[in-house]
């Protein structure tokens, strides 16, 4: 029990330290409109905050990228991902000893991003999807440790996300109806 408790403590302390570190980084950010802030000290856009989620954009962001990034981050807010991801991390911290929990948390983070991408691009043209994919690739973050709270634009499974974006087809009415019928049965 003490080893398990130490593991939980380490993961929760890591979360707290990460939170404080990010909070310090965005302290000097400038509000540009609504809940959107620009910051010189970050390299990738993300959402931060649980009670009052804010979108933080790096100052290096080009004007053509802003539209896609803000659409993506606003989709996270509408989906309440800023609440789900920390909750998932707490579950991960409690069940850290189970290797399937590590896998589940990684897949959970990937699925959050892919669901958000689908929500953003569902009515877009092929050209808009291509532009979105290029922006996503420009923010790809490689070799990162498991993150706690921020929902970063290029955080997880970029190759798979880009494939999903470029091959996305809106499901037909009949497919959705069949899936609902299957669930009822």
Where are these regions (language model features)?
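Membrane-embedded and juxtamembrane structural elements of multi-pass membrane proteins
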Residues: 1-185
